[in-house]
């Protein structure tokens, strides 16, 4: 981890980083209709958010199955889980809360939940106002994320790109 924000690691291999409250501009004036117009949003409470997507191995350890389509190869468990709905994700969180009931991390006893759309965008923007958290140049996207143009038509192991 390159910064000094508080974090904790769970027993499933996940790292969760503290996101402090703050204000930001949410939306994109040149984006889809649902992203317009940009507007000010305040995040009022701190929260912890996963540093990486939930892996297939983590999902299977909690849910007892792996619904993902891209399961070939020795590193499949390190790939992000996919083929899950919002309802599936809510069930995952519910089961995680059952398993973790009363667990204390960094002196805090809390519950797992999905971030709101505002919380997710605030965290993903990382204090920037550019199109991407790393800037405005599409040509830099290959360094920061997997997509149809560089993934070989498959998901890839989490944590392989710049943060």
Language-model features: where?
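Acidic, Ser/Thr/Gly/Pro-rich low-complexity segments and short DxT(G/T)-type signature motifs
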Residues: 1-6
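A short glycine-rich, aromatic-capped structural motif
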Residues: 8-68, 84-87
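Functional-site microenvironments in short loops/helix caps that host divalent-cation chemistry
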Residues: 25, 30, 75, 83-163
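Short, solvent-exposed beta-strand edge segments and adjacent coil->beta transition regions
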Residues: 38, 44-46, 76-78, 153-155
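A short, structure-level motif marking secondary-structure boundaries and short turns
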Residues: 43, 59, 77-78, 105
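N-terminal, well-ordered alpha-helical segments
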Residues: 57-61, 79, 90-94
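Surface-exposed, flexible coil segments in extracellular/virion-facing regions
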Residues: 70, 75-76
